[in-house]
Regions:
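A beta-strand edge to alpha-helix "cap/lid" segment located at domain peripheries
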Residues: 31-109
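Hydrophobic pocket/interface hotspot
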Residues: 1-2, 6, 19, 23, ...
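A solvent-exposed, acidic/Ser-Thr-rich amphipathic alpha-helical stretch
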Residues: 4-50
Length: 109
């Protein structure tokens, strides 16, 4: 679940994307892009209260290895409040920028 005032921080978009609709759009596009990418979370750090997590992931798309981190904050209702994505290496970041942009355009209809 996503909070109405949630914020998404993309590794390639310079301004935070605010609002449930935009956060949902970015997460949905990522789900489509990573769908067949052998995506896996390989490590996690969760705070004692359980409302913040850093999740390291790996994937591979078009022969390019992707390593990244999702930093997620949940509000007191258990809804996503803040979602930040970091990606490396640069080759993977550039490829994801292209694929995410295309997917978001496709989803607009």
């Amino acid at each position: 679940q996503i909070a109405d005032d949630a914020v998404f921080h993309s590794p390639v978009v310079h301004t935070p994307q605010a609002g449930k609709h935009l956060v949902f759009a970015y997460l949905s596009a990522a789900d489509q892009v990573f769908g067949d990418a052998n995506f896996a979370y390989v490590d996690e750090i969760v705070d004692d209260a359980g409302n913040k997590a850093m999740l390291e992931f790996t994937a591979e798309i078009d022969g390019i290895h992707i390593n990244g981190i999702d930093i997620i904050h949940w509000n007191d209702e258990g809804k996503i409040q803040n979602f930040k994505v970091l990606v490396r290496p640069m080759k993977a970041l550039n490829m994801l920028w292209e694929k995410m942009g295309a997917m978001l355009e496709t989803m607009k209809g």
